[in-house]
Structures are given as structure tokens and as C-alpha cells.
């Protein structure tokens, strides 16, 4: 696994929203989707908060586990990895800290058991 450069992770982690596109089996990218993301440790984490496991982008991840990210002025090739759910509470805390200015119901959509079950780690490729 390749790690993010510190400045890259900082820039992406500070971005209010990021865009990701999941790679299809034919090598093309699915449409970009806008999601919230939080840095934790040496990685960036995203969740499918609105549609959960039914979101098209989330369902596409297992096809190739690859894609592209646009965040903080950067565009990078990425890999999607299963998150260690032992850190869900820490990722929750990162979401609460970064997005605390949003109404409770909006922020809380990222903290539900279903959203937590969709936590994905994003690493550079």
C-alpha cells in the first residue's frame, strides 16, 4: 500500500467536499459523485451516508477497487480498501469535528449504523 504524502492528505482532508469516481471493469470511470471525507491517521475515509449500500458508487467499488479523487486542488488515482471497523468511533469523531457546523440530522446521517457499515479507506495508487 502506498501512503499519502502529508501535504496531499492535509489538502484533501481540509476540502469541504471531495469528488470520487469509481473505475469500471472496462477501465473507464463512472460519473463523479460528491461526498464528505475525513482524514484519520495516514488515510482518507468516506461513507455512503445518503443512500448507504444502495448508492451506485458504493455498489461499484467491489468491481475494481480503483478510481480517482478530486479534492483540495488535487487529482489522484486511488484505491478503495475495506476500512477497519475497529476505528469507526474515531472516524465518527473526525466527522463530528470537521462537519459540526451542519444541522444535526445532516451530520448524523454520516454516523448511523448503516453509514458506518459503508466506511471505505481511500489510499493513493
Outline where the language-model segments fall.
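Short secondary-structure boundary/capping segments
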Residues: 9-10, 36, 110-112
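Short, solvent-exposed coil/turn segments
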Residues: 13-15, 30, 62, 115
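Short hydrophobic/aromatic-rich motifs at helix boundaries and adjacent loops
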Residues: 6, 28-31, 63-65
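Short beta-strand segments
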Residues: 15-50, 79
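Extreme N-terminal tail/first-helix region
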Residues: 1-19
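Short, P/G- and charge-enriched loop/turn segments at secondary-structure junctions
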Residues: 6-8, 23-24, 106-109
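Short, structured beta-strand-loop surface elements
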Residues: 51-125
Amino acid at each position: 500500500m502506498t501512503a499519502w504524502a502529508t501535504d496531499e492528505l492535509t489538502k484533501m482532508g481540509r476540502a469541504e467536499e471531495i469528488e470520487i469516481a469509481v473505475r469500471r471493469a472496462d477501465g473507464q470511470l463512472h460519473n463523479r459523485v460528491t461526498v464528505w471525507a475525513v482524514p484519520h491517521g495516514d488515510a482518507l475515509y468516506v461513507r455512503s451516508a445518503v443512500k448507504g449500500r444502495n448508492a451506485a458508487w458504493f455498489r461499484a467499488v467491489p468491481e475494481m477497487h480503483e478510481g480517482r479523487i478530486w479534492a483540495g486542488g488535487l487529482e489522484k488515482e486511488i484505491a478503495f480498501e475495506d476500512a477497519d471497523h475497529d476505528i469507526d468511533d474515531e472516524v465518527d469523531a473526525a466527522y463530528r469535528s470537521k462537519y459540526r457546523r451542519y444541522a444535526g440530522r445532516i451530520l448524523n446521517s454520516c454516523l448511523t449504523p448503516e453509514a458506518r457499515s459503508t466506511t471505505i479507506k481511500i489510499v493513493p495508487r
